């Protein structure tokens, strides 16, 4: 992809960062990413990737904008909530205003084992904007089976987690978590609440990892499970070694795709 004069100006400061440069920017503009869920995490990631010039974004979510979303979710406003606009349609409209050169494909549906392949087809990366571990395990199985990188993240209350997964190189989600936690023990934002800045900050970190991969610099990712408490400012970086007993990346069992 050649850089136009407008591109040279729009992305000038990003290209001036030597780790990206012109070659990295061209790679970013030629890349595609699937964002599964455009709520708290996904809305911010979508905006940041669009501003960074990612060529094509597929956004998938079946939810509508609610007033309780506004304190932590980017792209949406009170008018969207009043009209109960589908998130993907509201998001697509805002993203077009931010960067009309980015192709945005809005899919008003919930990602599952039956549609993840069609959603991810032709993409270079999956970004986790979901709110449940079952969907994350589906994404993980697809990622490992088809060697497609993805970035796990989640926030509840003030506690956030982040881990990039590059098949054949890093641990996968099932190396770390044997199974999705039971629904009764997995608190949600509805039950435990959520700190808005925690969501925006971990989404920015997710986006930075995504840009490393899309710019051809996956060597620079942070190969850890990072945990941050945004209320106490405690940060943990936990080694995320490949588990020799992992049924997914080591055993080749993709149970959550087959379910």
Predicted segments, located by residue:
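Adenine nucleotide-associated cytosolic modules
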Residues: 1-259
């Amino acid at each position: 992809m050649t850089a136009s004069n407008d591109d040279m100006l729009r992305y000038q400061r990003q290209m001036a960062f030597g780790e990206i440069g012109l070659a990295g920017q061209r790679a970013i503009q030629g890349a595609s990413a699937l964002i599964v869920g455009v709520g708290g995490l996904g809305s911010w990631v979508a905006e940041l990737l669009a501003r960074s010039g990612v060529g094509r974004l597929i956004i998938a979510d079946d939810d509508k904008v609610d007033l309780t979303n506004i304190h932590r979710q980017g792209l949406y406003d009170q008018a969207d909530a009043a009209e109960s606009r589908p998130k993907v349609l509201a998001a697509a409209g805002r993203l077009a205003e931010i960067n009309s050169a980015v192709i945005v494909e809005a899919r008003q549906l919930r990602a599952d084992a039956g549609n993840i392949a069609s959603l991810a087809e032709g993409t270079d990366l999956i970004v986790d904007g979901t709110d449940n571990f079952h969907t994350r395990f589906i994404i993980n199985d697809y990622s490992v089976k088809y060697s497609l990188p993805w970035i796990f993240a989640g926030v509840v209350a003030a506690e956030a987690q982040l881990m990039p997964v590059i098949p054949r190189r890093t641990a996968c989600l099932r190396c770390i978590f044997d199974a999705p936690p039971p629904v009764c023990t997995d608190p949600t934002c509805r039950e435990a609440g959520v700190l808005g800045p925690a969501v925006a900050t971990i989404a920015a970190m997710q986006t930075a990892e995504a840009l490393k991969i899309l710019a051809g610099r996956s060597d620079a990712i942070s190969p850890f499970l990072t945990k941050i408490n945004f209320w106490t400012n405690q940060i943990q970086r936990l080694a995320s070694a490949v588990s020799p007993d992992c049924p997914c990346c080591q055993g080749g069992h993709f149970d959550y795709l087959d379910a």
